[in-house]
Amino acid sequence: MTVVETTPQAGLSPQQLAMLFQYTVEAYKVFEKLAENLPNPMTRAMFAQFAVDEREDRDLIEMKAAAVGARGVRVTLGSDMIFSDILEGEMSYRESAEFLISRERTLQRKLREMIGIAPNADRNFLVYLEAVKRAHIVELERDLELIRIDQDWWKREDAEWRIVHGSPAV
């Protein structure tokens, strides 16, 4: 008879929750600003929904922290300088979309890794957060393709018309 020693799996650490919270707060700020500032109504709506998603994720992270007894999730508000570049128009729309896709993918990968070793009590939480990231990636990739067709896609106030009729001939 073989005996396998098992140790109870610990849940999410305060550091992991803090990392998720930090990412969520930063992403919320960027998505909210993009939703406020971009003239393209379709892209504006996409980023507004992303901001709602990040607020919901933040609330879930706070609830999870409370459930596991973590004492408040601290966050430093020094976000990436690249976010400033995006919001100030220092990056092209293509570069901005590529950066946002990369950032969402990075967190999605971290969440996938966490799901693989998480105890059952944390899996639903992590799967939910990972699916939100996956959905954001799909929509950002769609916008990136539209930017490749029209480099000023995020500026287009006539976005719906262009989707239906195509870009006018120059």
Sequence positions of predicted segments:
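Iron-associated oxidoreductase/ferritin-like identity signal
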Residues: 1-170
